[in-house]
Structures are given as structure tokens and as C-alpha cells.
Regions:
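Flanking helices and flexible, charged tails adjoining ferredoxin-like Fe-S electron-transfer domains
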Residues: 41-56, 87-88, 96-98, 102-226
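Multi-pass alpha-helical membrane architecture of UbiA-family
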Residues: 297, 301, 439-443, 503-509
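Membrane helical hairpin/interfacial module
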Residues: 251-314, 321
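Juxtamembrane/interface segments at transmembrane-helix termini
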Residues: 289-290, 422-427, 497-508
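N-terminal signal-anchor module of multipass membrane proteins
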Residues: 197-261, 502
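Secondary-structure capping and boundary motifs in well-ordered enzyme cores
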Residues: 61, 87-91, 108, 127, ...
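Ferredoxin-type iron-sulfur electron-transfer modules and their immediate structural context
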Residues: 1-82, 87-90, 96-98, 102
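Long, contiguous internal "core" modules enriched in hydrophobic/ aromatic residues
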Residues: 230-233, 237-244, 256-262, 303-306, ...
Length: 509
């Protein structure tokens, strides 16, 4: 059984009765919506048209929000409804990143995720959803799409229909009849400086110039709802802090396996950086929750298909291993140090790279779906981790061998980071969403931050590191690589800032 909707835009009059009925039935806060009507105007006066599109959750067959939700607060019922339990929700907002339809919001009253649930409480009592009942033109159909005898199945099977973003392969169960493609395609109709009754929200105005639009039709959105970026500076910073921790421990572990004595830098500084990185990362993630008091639900109500949960376990185990490292060094237990060194490599790889799998579950953010992101995170981690070790090494007595390893790791990782940037932004992208976001980074609103704040300083740091490597481990080279190690820290933060923001700037509705 799969309950779903069919929206007949041929008969929809854009009256908003469905929106009002939904808000009343479900006590939806002011300014938030489970269903809404989007207006798109096309053409030029006097040859203009206005198209409507009823937007809502698509109750996907393969719902990405269910997969990414760390606490099973979102779940798929036996009747196909994607429902939510706000008693389990921690407000991590990952579901908002996973949904390609802008259907999920954080309820202002409960600080938990909410969305259209097909009025499940009414369905359970053999009643139709409120929007279906109130629609004056019977433009909203509901029923079992798996039952060929149902009215909705007959309607869908006998008419040409369309779905939103079919390329995401989520199996959407909201079918549109007679909908203008400019309504369904979020890139086709940017906003102007005003809606028909109000100003667009600041985020839509900020990003309107990024969108390619449809020059032939001149389509523009004249009514829509606000969808601000769910993730901000805390997630940007988290990408940097966990990179420092993972990279520092990986280089120290490699030194032990190669028989290079790092002294205090390897015994205490590297694991301390690892603990700092992991602990700060965890703190940032908890602070970013809308219900931070529920953070333990991540472990008590776990959904093990979510990389938020798996990442939480990686952070915990990584921190524990780093603490054991310091203990083994203090007690001078050689075999334990060797064992931990072997374990540090895969642990650091997971620590740095699990975000690639988490972002891979964020189906609504095509820029983040990069096939090279995992390797990019590894290069970034070693770059900032070895850079931090180089700075600390200035104040410690390091052998020439140790300096050579730190400098070499820094140069190789920094060059790898730059090469992957070239591959990522000079190559083709898998979707228009990703290509548009990449263009915004390299040539649009974020170009100055990307080039002058990140790429140029990183190139200079790579050159400085290469010169230091060629000079050998003397006082000048160590100071040079330490300065380069300092430079790449804000440079990486600048890149992560535009990467995280641009991925969320592409509209989904």
C-alpha cells in the first residue's frame, strides 16, 4: 500500500484553501507551512500567464529523510505515509538537507522537525486529509497508488503526469497533472525584487541572481515561502576542527610506524590536538541542535542507517583512542603505542571522511554529492593537521627526520587539496543544481572569498612548504612551514564556508 497525492494544476485556482486548512488542522505556526501554493508568472505584458503549484512532502517510496534521521523520528508507515514523531526529534536539521523538496521545517513551537504527514490522524479514522476536503475544485486527489482500482491510480495511469526532481530517484508519490515545468523546476523561475503581495525573504533575494532561469519564457516566481539555510557557521567550523584532529593523529601514527621519533609532539601534542578536534566537533554539533538537551538520543534511539549516528560513534571512539594514546605514552608502553599507531590510520580516515557519507545522504544538496569529497576531506585533514603540528614543532626539539615528515605530509596534502579543487570545480557536475552552485563559488557571489580567501593563500602556503622541503630541516625552513601551516587554517575555513553555504543556496521548491 502506498498512499499519495495527485495535484491537478489544470483546475487549481491558487486560492490557498489547502494551505489554510492544513495550518488550521495541524496548528502550524505563523510563517511556516506543510503545504503551500507557489505562483510563477511567465511572458511579458500583455502576453502573460500565471501558473500555480501546490508544494508539499512527496511521501517518497525511498525517503532520504528517513535514512538520514539519527533517532528514527521520521519513519515510513505501512500505508506509505512518511510520518514524524516529535518526541524523538533532536532538531539536527539533517532531514531538511536530505529532502529534495523543501518539505521539512523546524516547528517554531516545539523546535522539532515537522512536515505534511498526509493528516495521518485523519487517515487513521477513515477521513481524507484536510486539504483534500477543502479544495473547491477537487484539484487534490488522495488514495492508494498501489491499488489499480482506486480513483487516484486511474487518474495517474490515464493522464500524463510529472513529478518534482525525478533525477533524485526518491520515488516521489505526489503526481502533477498539467503543471508548468517552471513551477516544478526550482531553478527555472528566480524571484524578482518583489512578490505580488510582499517582499521575498532575504535569502531568496540574495540567491535570485545565481539562478539560470528560462530566458525564452521569462518566468519568475511571484509567490513562495521562505526556506533559510539550515546549517551555518557551526557546521563550517566542525569540518575544520575534526580535520585538525584527524590529520594530526594520522601523521603522528605514521611517524611511529616509520620508526621516526616525534618526541613530545607525537606522544602528547598530536593526541591532544586529536582530542581537542573531536571534543570541539562534538560540542559544535550539540550546540547546533534545536533540542540540545536530547543529544543522548543519538545513542539511545539510534538509526544505524544514518551517518550522523555512525559519525557520533566515530567521534566517541576516536576521542577514547586519543586518550589511551596519551596514557600509553606517559606509561611508556611501547607495544600499546605501536598498536594505537596502527589503529590511528583507519580511525583518522574515518574521522576525517565520515562527513562525505553524511553529505552523501543529503539528497537535497547536489553540490555535496561529489564522488571526490571523501578524498578531499582526507587531504584537507592532513593539510591542517600537519600544519598545526608544524606550528607546535617550533616550540619543541624535533629531529630532522621528524621535521622532514611533517613538512612532506603538509606539502603533499596541500597540493592534493588544490588538485582536487581543480578537478571539482573545473570538471562537469552531475546535475544543474551542482553546476549552478559550483559556478556561484568560482564566478558568482562567493568568488572573492573562494579565490582570495582560500585558493591564493593555499597556493602560497604550498609553495612555501615546497621551498622548506627543498631546503631541508633548518631553522629557516621550519619557520617557513610553520607560517604556511598557520595560513592554511583560515584558508580552509574560508573554503568550507562557501562550500557549505553554496550547497544550501540552491532552491528546492
Amino acid at each position: 500500500m502506498q498512499l499519495g497525492f495527485a495535484i491537478d494544476q489544470r483546475t487549481c485556482i491558487g486560492c490557498h484553501a489547502c494551505t489554510v486548512a492544513c495550518k488550521t488542522e495541524n496548528d502550524v505556526p505563523v510563517g511556516q507551512f506543510r503545504t503551500w501554493v507557489k505562483y510563477v508568472d511567465s511572458g511579458e505584458f500583455p502576453d502573460t500567464t500565471r501558473s500555480f503549484g501546490v508544494m508539499r512532502c512527496n511521501h517518497c517510496t525511498d525517503a532520504p529523510c528517513v535514512k538520514i534521521c539519527p533517532t528514527q523520528a521520521l519513519f515510513k508507515r505501512d500505508d506509505g505515509i512518511v510520518d514524524f514523531d516529535n518526541e524523538r526529534c533532536i532538531g539536527c536539521k539533517s532531514c531538511m538537507q536530505a529532502c529534495p523538496y523543501d518539505a521539512i521545517y523546524i516547528d517554531a513551537q516545539t523546535n522539532t522537525a515537522a512536515k505534511c504527514n498526509l493528516c495521518a490522524h485523519r487517515v487513521d479514522n477513515d477521513l481524507e486529509p484536510a486539504c483534500v476536503v477543502v479544495c473547491p475544485t477537487h484539484s487534490i486527489w488522495v488514495g492508494d497508488l498501489d491499488d489499480p482500482t482506486s480513483g487516484i491510480s486511474k487518474l495517474v495511469s490515464t493522464h500524463q503526469t510529472a513529478v518534482r526532481t525525478p533525477e533524485q530517484n526518491t520515488g516521489p508519490n505526489v503526481f502533477y497533472l498539467g503543471a508548468d515545468q517552471a513551477v516544478l523546476d526550482p531553478l527555472a523561475a528566480p524571484v524578482d525584487d518583489t512578490y505580488i503581495w510582499a517582499k521575498p525573504d532575504a535569502h531568496r533575494l540574495e540567491t535570485a541572481g545565481d539562478l539560470p532561469g528560462n530566458p525564452r519564457k521569462g518566468s519568475r516566481t511571484t509567490l513562495n515561502t521562505a526556506h533559510p539555510r539550515p546549517w551555518g557557521w557551526k557546521v563550517v567550523t566542525y569540518l575544520w576542527t575534526k580535520g585538525i584532529g584527524a590529520g594530526a593523529l594520522a601523521v603522528a601514527g605514521l611517524a611511529i610506524l616509520l620508526g621516526i621519533d616525534f618526541g613530545v609532539l607525537g606522544d602528547y601534542v598530536a593526541p591532544a590536538l586529536a582530542i581537542f578536534g573531536a571534543a570541539t566537533t562534538g560540542a559544535l554539533l550539540v550546540l547546533d541542535l534545536k533540542r540540545p538537551e536530547r543529544f543522548l538520543y543519538l545513542f539511545l534511539k539510534s538509526n544505524f542507517s544514518s551517518w550522523l549516528v555512525l559519525g557520533g560513534y566515530v567521534l566517541t571512539l576516536f576521542t577514547g583512542g586519543s586518550m589511551l594514546w596519551i596514557l600509553a605514552a606517559a606509561l611508556e608502553i611501547g607495544w600499546a603505542m605501536t598498536t594505537l599507531a596502527w589503529l590511528s590510520i583507519p580511525a583518522s580516515v574515518l574521522m576525517a571522511g565520515y562527513t562525505a557519507f553524511l553529505f552523501g545522504q543529503a539528497e537535497g544538496r547536489d553540490l555535496w554529492q561529489s564522488p571526490v569529497l571523501f578524498w578531499h576531506l582526507q587531504a584537507q585533514a592532513v593539510m591542517v593537521g600537519s600544519g598545526a603540528l608544524a606550528v607546535a614543532g617550533l616550540f619543541l626539539d624535533l629531529s630532522d627526520e621528524a621535521w622532514t615528515l611533517v613538512i612532506g605530509a603538509f606539502v603533499v596534502a596541500t597540493v592534493a587539496h588544490l588538485v582536487i579543487l581543480l578537478v571539482e570545480y573545473a570538471g562537469k557536475h552531475a546535475s544543474r543544481q551542482a553546476a549552478t552552485a559550483a559556478h556561484v563559488i568560482t564566478s558568482g557571489r562567493y568568488a572573492k572569498t573562494f579565490w582570495m580567501g582560500s585558493v591564493v593563500p593555499t597556493v602560497l602556503a604550498a609553495i612555501a612548504g615546497a621551498v622548506a622541503w627543498a631546503m631541508g630541516a633548518d631553522t629557516t625552513s621550519t619557520v617557513l612551514v610553520a607560517l604556511a601551516g598557520l595560513v592554511v587554517q583560515p584558508a580552509l575555513l574560508a573554503y568550507e564556508s562557501v562550500f557549505v553555504r553554496a550547497g544550501q543556496d540552491m532552491p528546492l521548491s
